[in-house]
Regions:
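YjeF_N-associated NAD(P)HX repair module
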Residues: 114-222
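Nucleotide and nucleotide-moiety/phosphate-recognizing core
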Residues: 32-120, 131-150
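Catalytic cores of large soluble enzymes that bind and process phosphate-bearing ligands
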Residues: 15-18, 22, 26, 80, ...
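Positively charged, low-complexity intrinsically disordered leader regions
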Residues: 1-48, 201-222
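Amphipathic, alpha-helical segments enriched in basic
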Residues: 1-5, 9, 112, 116, ...
């Protein structure tokens, strides 16, 4: 966890990446990975309905580009009052992407309405107890049967140790580099995304990242 935070900090300070720049690149990676694993044609319904569940941090940026080509609905209960996040919310609204006023209380309702859930609630920096409303949200998501795609780390997991009795996503998209908890991931699809880590930084932290194929921004690990 500390190493991942240090890499992020160096990208911002030493390499002068901006927050929105990294979030857009990460968002493109997430969109590409999900489109590869769950193309719209693979949905059993005529409309590829996707529920994107967002936490209070940067996660919504990672999901923005995913929304193209699908029928997304966003649940975003804790919205930071910062221009970066307010601007993105406005963009979604201008694209007629609906925001749920309340999270579906029943897992069966999510199974009925959506073919995929994107878990963009917590990132690798999360620690401590899960607060409401996210505790109830995760409890519901643990009971659904439609696939879950988690971004960077399944929400509620310890970034080092994972969580055997927590969320068990079908897909994990590791950004920058896989976190230690990824060793406990047992889903079908594990992708690496975020093709923006300079070679010198990879070498400094001994990341040993596999090469990305050609011009792709994601790499399927499993």
């Amino acid at each position: 966890q500390e190493e991942a935070q240090a890499i992020d900090q160096e990208l911002f300070t030493e390499y002068k990446f901006s927050v929105d720049q990294l979030m857009e690149l990460a968002g493109l990676s997430c969109a590409t990975a999900i489109a590869k694993a769950y193309p719209p044609s693979s949905f059993t319904t005529s409309q590829p309905a996707v529920l994107v569940v967002c936490g209070p941090g940067k996660a919504l940026f990672r999901s923005l580009l995913l929304l193209q080509g699908y029928e997304p609905t966003v649940y975003y209960p804790k919205r930071p009052s910062k221009p970066l996040f307010e601007g993105l919310t406005t963009q979604c609204q201008k694209m007629d992407i609906p925001f749920l006023p309340e999270f579906p209380a029943e897992a069966a309702l999510i199974d009925e309405l959506y073919g995929l859930v994107v878990d963009a609630i917590f990132g690798f920096s999360f620690k401590g107890a899960v607060r409401e409303p996210f505790g109830s949200i995760l409890s519901t998501l643990e009971r659904i049967t439609v696939p879950i795609a988690s971004i960077d780390i399944p929400s509620g997991w310890d970034v080092e140790k994972g969580k055997a009795d927590g969320l068990q996503p079908d897909m994990l998209i590791s950004l920058t580099a896989p976190k230690k908890a990824a060793m406990h991931f047992t889903g079908r699809y594990h992708f690496l995304g975020g093709r923006f880590v300079p070679a010198a930084l990879q070498e400094k932290y001994a990341l040993n990242l596999p090469p990305y194929p050609e011009t792709d921004c994601v790499l399927q690990l499993t």
